[in-house]
Regions:
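Active-site neighborhoods of divalent-metal-dependent phosphate/nucleic-acid chemistry enzymes
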Residues: 76-124
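Short, conserved alpha-helical segments within structured domains
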Residues: 41-46, 104
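Active-site regions of enzymes building and remodeling cell-envelope glycoconjugates
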Residues: 128-133
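Short, well-structured N-terminal submotif of metal-dependent ribonuclease cores
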Residues: 1-41, 56-68
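Hydrophobic helix-cap positions at the C-terminus of alpha-helices
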Residues: 30-31, 73, 111
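Catalytic metal-binding/acid-base residues of hydrolase active sites
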Residues: 10, 125-126
């Protein structure tokens, strides 16, 4: 199975004080033990991780520090990780994307589907994505 990691997965994985940190750490550990698994990131989730990390109310850090944390996270995945270039424009949207708040979710879902991946997320409001439980 191949997953595109959503911003919220990266944020929860990266910060121990996040409410879903332990759940995401367990899920990633399970993926590391499985065969044939690939975990993808793309520009939007990586930039989202940096943006959210810099804006956190607890333990704010610099952009460079956030990038270093992200780099360490991705390096820890070894060969499981691949970067997925974003090759989608902004001209097609699924019918459920009716507001600005859903545009990133919709774009990432469409990107994942285009490349035969499953979007892994903590957001129950993304139809067709895999909700981490």
């Amino acid at each position: 199975m191949a997953h595109l990691l959503d911003v919220n997965i990266l944020v929860a994985w990266g910060w121990r004080d996040h409410a879903d940190h332990d759940r995401v750490v367990r899920w990633i550990a399970e993926r590391k033990m499985a065969h044939g698994v690939k975990l993808f990131t793309s520009l939007i989730p990586e930039m989202g991780f940096v943006r959210v990390s810099v804006q956190r109310s607890s333990g704010r850090i610099s952009v460079q520090q956030a990038a270093e944390v992200l780099q360490g996270m991705l390096k820890s995945l070894g060969k499981l990780h691949q970067f997925l270039p974003d090759d989608l424009g902004a001209t097609e949207w699924p019918s459920w994307c009716g507001s600005a708040a859903r545009t990133t979710d919709a774009h990432l879902l469409m990107l994942a589907l285009r490349h035969g991946l499953v979007l892994a997320t903590l957001d129950a409001g993304i139809p067709g994505a895999m909700l981490l439980t």
